[in-house]
């Protein structure tokens, strides 16, 4: 396994960890991790791997889904993008997890959560923000919820893997209102988890 750190005058730009493997047509560089501080770091890392082309037939690289790879490569004829996103995550304490999802000053939202493995996660939770402080309160049983989800969908919303609209395609997810606040609390963003379980 090889590890390389790429820097400029201001400090680290990116790092690359890869392992040589035998492929069908020759040696493949299997990039286990590629992290970059800014777009220039990604360009430098890809350029570095390109310079190793005499030793490797190809490189297999996992990148965040929001990286416009075709726009970065001048000649992307030999790229074969595939979608291999299998992140594993699970909320184990709903109240603490929702604490990180502020609704916006003076706003609140409610989420009904169902968790078949951890009964303490079941219930309707109200998340409020006042004076910069976020509070999460478990409401009495039967309270109305703006959003109803199981813990798996909640986890995907919390890490930004799903947008609110995408979550609505999942079975058992219902939206009753407060759409604008829920959008602010659960924005979609690139999920880039490279740890293997």
Model-derived regions: residue spans:
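Intrinsically disordered, low-complexity, positively biased terminal segments
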Residues: 1-197
């Amino acid at each position: 396994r090889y590890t390389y750190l790429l820097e400029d005058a201001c400090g680290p730009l990116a790092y690359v960890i890869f392992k040589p493997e035998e492929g069908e047509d020759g040696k493949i560089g299997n990039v286990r991790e590629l992290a970059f501080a800014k777009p220039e770091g990604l360009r430098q890392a890809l350029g570095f791997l390109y310079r190793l082309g005499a030793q490797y037939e190809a490189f297999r690289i996992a990148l965040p889904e929001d990286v416009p790879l075709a726009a970065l490569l001048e000649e992307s004829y030999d790229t074969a993008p595939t979608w291999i996103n299998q992140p594993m995550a699970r909320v184990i304490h709903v109240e603490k997890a929702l604490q990180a999802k502020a609704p916006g000053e003076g706003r609140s939202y409610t989420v009904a959560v169902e968790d078949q493995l951890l009964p303490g996660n079941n219930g309707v939770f109200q998340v409020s923000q006042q004076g910069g402080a976020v509070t999460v309160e478990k409401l009495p049983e039967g309270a109305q919820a703006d959003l109803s989800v199981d813990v798996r969908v909640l986890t995907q919303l919390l890490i930004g893997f799903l947008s609110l609209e995408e979550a609505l395609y999942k079975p058992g997810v219902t939206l009753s209102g407060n759409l604008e606040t829920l959008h602010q609390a659960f924005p979609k963003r690139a999920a880039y988890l490279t740890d293997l379980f």
